[in-house]
């Protein structure tokens, strides 16, 4: 299995509910790198990169989000891998 990298955008009740914090924790558990950033329109952008199986598990998790959130829409597309290591939030 190779590495995959996607940029994901989620909408709904995803800001002010710990979404980025829980996303970072889950990504680190899965050995992924990337970021989770709040956007001005109320959505969250997530860049995830890592082993294919871990990335696919993360995509499934992002569709639901943490219990504190309510994801109403999610879109993703292939993206260049992030420079550097770790998982960052703004």
From Swiss-Prot:
Positions of the catalytic residues: 20, 38
Pfam families assigned: Acylphosphatase
Keyword Transport recorded: no
Family annotation (PROSITE patterns): ACYLPHOSPHATASE_1, ACYLPHOSPHATASE_3
Domain Acylphosphatase-like per the UniProt entry, residue ranges: 5-90
Catalysed transformations (reactions): an acyl phosphate + H2O = a carboxylate + phosphate + H(+)
Enzyme class: hydrolase
Gene3D superfamilies: 3.30.70.100
GO molecular function annotations of the record: acylphosphatase activity
InterPro entries (UniProt xref): Acylphosphatase (IPR020456), Acylphosphatase-like_dom (IPR001792), Acylphosphatase-like_dom_sf (IPR036046), Acylphosphatase_CS (IPR017968)
EC number: 3.6.1.7
Keywords: Hydrolase
PANTHER family: ACYLPHOSPHATASE
Family classification: Belongs to the acylphosphatase family.
Name recorded for this polypeptide: Acylphosphatase
Naturally occurring in which organism (per UniProt): Aeromonas hydrophila subsp. hydrophila (strain ATCC 7966 / DSM 30187 / BCRC 13018 / CCUG 14551 / JCM 1027 / KCTC 2358 / NCIMB 9240 / NCTC 8049)
């Amino acid at each position: 299995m190779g590495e995959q990298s996607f940029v994901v955008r989620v909408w709904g009740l995803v800001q002010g509910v710990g979404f980025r914090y829980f996303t970072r924790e889950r990504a680190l558990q899965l050995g992924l790198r990337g970021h989770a950033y709040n956007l001005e329109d109320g959505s969250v952008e997530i860049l995830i990169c890592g082993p294919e199986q871990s990335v696919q598990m993360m995509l499934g998790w992002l569709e639901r989000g943490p219990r504190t959130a309510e994801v109403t829409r999610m879109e993703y597309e292939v993206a260049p891998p992030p420079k550097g290591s770790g998982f960052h939030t703004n």
